Design a protein with these regions (language model features):
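Early exported N-terminus immediately downstream of N-terminal targeting peptides
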Residues: 58-61, 65
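Long, amphipathic alpha-helical surface segments
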Residues: 2-5, 12-13, 23-53, 65, ...
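Short N-proximal segments of mature Sec-exported proteins
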Residues: 104-118
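Surface-exposed patches in mature extracellular/periplasmic domains of secreted proteins
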Residues: 54-58, 96-106, 144
């Protein structure tokens, strides 16, 4: 019994000494990330959450690019090619959302993951509440933005975390 308590106390002591160092390292990383221009933050965020897709992720290649009909891209692309493809995709989407001004990059990143039509609507798909709020001039969008955290009808904690990180990195007050 005493051995278990000693081990527990030793583990606690190690945690108390190690975690502040890890926290300081994480803070330096966050400072570096926030020192980047917004587009670079968006690219870093997408790369982190999407990862480099392989053959099992077809029809997605690179960092989440969805192959379009007639496109002949291989999943065996280099990181540099995938980065270039990601940036080209983001620039195309930025044009679509430029009317939202300082929120255009945030909407671009969200649309890269969920699709433009989930936000803007198309046919029977209505505009999202997020876009409706922004169009009316209301920028209190945290709840609407983080509501895009469902996959196949189920809420995923990882997606909710991703939305919070995107907001923290890209939302301009």
């Amino acid at each position: 019994m005493k051995t278990k308590i000693r081990r527990g106390l030793l583990a606690l002591l190690v945690c108390v000494q190690v975690f502040p160092a890890l926290n300081a390292q994480a803070q330096r990383g966050a400072d570096r990330l926030f020192s980047l221009p917004p587009l670079e933050r968006a690219v870093a965020c997408i790369k982190h959450y999407e990862g480099l897709h392989g053959p099992k992720n077809h029809p997605y290649v690179g960092y989440g690019h969805r192959l379009l009909p007639g496109e002949r891209l291989s999943c065996a692309m280099t990181r540099r090619q995938a980065d270039s493809l990601l940036r080209a995709d983001l620039k195309k989407r930025l044009v679509t959302f430029r009317r939202f001004g300082r929120d255009s990059l945030l909407l671009t990143v969200l649309s890269y993951n969920v699709g433009e039509y989930r936000l803007l609507g198309y046919g029977k798909q209505p505009k999202s509440r997020l876009v409706q709020k922004l169009e009316s001039g209301d920028r209190d969008i945290r709840d609407e933005y983080t509501s895009f955290c469902r996959y196949r009808g189920k809420e995923l904690r990882a997606l909710r975390l991703r939305r919070r990180v995107e907001l923290a990195l890209l939302y301009e007050k």
